């Protein structure tokens, strides 16, 4: 079958395209711009067009699109004209799973699902279970970064941003939490959002939930939490190199967890994984070994650069909700106790910024300095009055030293550089390009430019 993927450079879309390509289908696609994923897919022999055009056409049998691709996209218009079936990525992904008929491990929720999915995959690989993995991020130990083909169970990250996720029926499901992100896709109805989690839980053999989550804790056959749940934490210690935690089960000391990845949130992610595998009757000794070896996912507190001479760090992180940002900054302050923390934050989606107005500033005030950029639209229509300046204004009202930079290409030129500083480039958009340009500029100059943010301060 010949399949045309519209938006093939997306992290979720490219994983599905890889699966179909490696299973013998004739795959090609298009993307709005060149990305690391499009370059990688090309190296494997997948033809890719950039940008979108009605001429990007090899007479496919099927067209797959992401929700971000609008119906007036020229390739979608042509597909309709030529009566070629068009399917949403998530719908098609469910069809793949039905076709595979394998044991399914799924992770969904607002925060932490990529890292938790990666942990589950890493454990199964360590146990020699040969999983097929679909990941919403890049993990070095997966053959293709966000995808690996195996002959064992299927592990996948299930995006709750689309209500259709409730139509899946994995054997085992971890719900990290449910904070109402993407509520606009549920008609801004919290009850409809809650019902989607309830529906998928009814279709699942074993559900693991965060005991302290208001919307989904009651859905868990097994729960985990800080002080509440089947699996809880008695104590935790952390250093720059590792962190340890004592885990209790039903109120009794059960085991010790060691992690190389930093952050209290990652202890909770690992606790969910322990709850899952213990409930399934796995020997926990190799599970704990795998978790201790786990090295994380790209753009999750990823140290992109360190100059030991000046003790300057540049870290990339995908955090884009207030809770994720709060977790990130708490981790940064724990790991870098004596360094200044500067956050460069790119808000992601107008709808999220409008809904979370004020919450971003509350999370960001944990940093020493904050630079806010304009919103990365993620193909949303711009909303009047919704701008990154909202966060900047809120930070200023909280008495925080903050700056606003409207044009992203200018960002790395105006970020103040000083010794003993950690620069966190944060967001789910294209802020990573600014991170790289900042490092390039720093390496070429090795100077300390004066602050030139002028009236934006």
Swiss-Prot record:
Pathway: Cell wall biogenesis; peptidoglycan biosynthesis. ATP binds at residues 109-115. This is UDP-N-acetylmuramate--L-alanine ligase. It is found in: Cytoplasm. Keywords: ATP-binding, Cell cycle, Cell division, Cell shape, Cell wall biogenesis/degradation, Cytoplasm, Ligase, Nucleotide-binding, Peptidoglycan synthesis. It comes from the Bacteria. GO terms for biological process: cell division; cell wall organization; peptidoglycan biosynthetic process; regulation of cell shape. Cell wall formation. Its EC number is 6.3.2.8. The keyword GTP-binding does not apply. GO terms for cellular component: cytoplasm. GO terms for molecular function: ATP binding; UDP-N-acetylmuramate-L-alanine ligase activity. Pfam families: Mur_ligase, Mur_ligase_C, Mur_ligase_M. Belongs to the MurCDEF family. It comes from Thermotoga petrophila (strain ATCC BAA-488 / DSM 13995 / JCM 10881 / RKU-1). Coiled coil: none annotated. Its main location: cytoplasm. It catalyses: UDP-N-acetyl-alpha-D-muramate + L-alanine + ATP = UDP-N-acetyl-alpha-D-muramoyl-L-alanine + ADP + phosphate + H(+). Signal peptide: none annotated. The gene is murC.
């Amino acid at each position: 079958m010949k399949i045309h993927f519209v938006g093939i450079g997306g992290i979720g879309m490219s994983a599905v395209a890889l699966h179909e390509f490696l299973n013998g289908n004739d795959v090609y696609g298009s993307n709005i711009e060149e990305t690391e994923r499009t370059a990688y897919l090309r190296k494997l022999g997948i033809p890719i067009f950039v940008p979108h055009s009605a001429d990007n056409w090899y007479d496919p049998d099927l067209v797959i699109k992401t929700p971000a691709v609008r119906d007036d996209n020229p390739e979608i218009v042509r597909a309709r004209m030529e009566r070629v079936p068009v399917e949403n990525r998530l719908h098609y992904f469910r069809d793949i799973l039905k076709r595979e008929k394998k044991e399914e491990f799924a992770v969904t929720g607002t925060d932490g699902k990529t890292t938790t999915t990666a942990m589950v995959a890493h454990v199964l690989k360590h146990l020699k279970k040969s999983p097929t993995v679909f990941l919403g991020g890049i993990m070095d130990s997966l053959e293709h970064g966000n995808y690996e083909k195996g002959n064992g169970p299927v592990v996948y990250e299930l995006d709750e941003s689309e209500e259709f996720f409730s139509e899946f029926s994995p054997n085992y499901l971890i719900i990290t939490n449910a904070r109402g992100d993407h509520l606009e896709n549920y008609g801004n109805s919290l009850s409809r959002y809650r019902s989607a989690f309830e529906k998928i839980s009814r279709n699942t053999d074993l559900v693991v939930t965060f005991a302290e989550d208001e919307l989904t804790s009651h859905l868990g056959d097994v729960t985990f939490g800080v002080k509440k749940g089947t699996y809880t934490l008695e104590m935790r210690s952390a250093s720059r190199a590792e962190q340890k935690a004592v885990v209790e089960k039903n109120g009794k000391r059960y085991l010790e967890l060691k992690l190389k990845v930093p952050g209290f949130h990652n202890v909770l992610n690992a606790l969910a994984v322990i709850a899952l595998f213990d409930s399934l009757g796995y020997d926990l000794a190799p599970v704990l070994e795998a978790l201790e070896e786990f090295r994380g996912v790209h753009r999750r507190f990823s140290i992109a650069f360190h100059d030991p001479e000046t003790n300057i760090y540049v870290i990339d992180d995908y955090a884009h909700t207030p809770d994720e940002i709060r977790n990130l900054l708490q981790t940064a302050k724990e790991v870098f106790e004596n360094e200044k923390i500067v956050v460069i934050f790119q808000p992601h989606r107008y709808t999220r910024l409008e809904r979370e107005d004020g919450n971003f500033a509350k999370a960001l005030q944990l940093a020493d300095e904050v630079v806010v950029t304009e919103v990365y639209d993620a193909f949303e229509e711009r909303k009047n009055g919704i701008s990154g300046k909202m966060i900047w204004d809120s930070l200023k009202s909280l008495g925080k030293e903050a700056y606003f930079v409207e044009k992203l290409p200018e960002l790395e030129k105006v970020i103040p550089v000083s010794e003993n500083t950690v620069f966190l480039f944060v967001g789910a958009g294209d802020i990573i390009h600014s991170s790289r340009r900042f490092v390039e500029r720093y390496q070429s100059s090795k100077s300390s430019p004066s602050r030139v943010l002028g009236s934006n301060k």
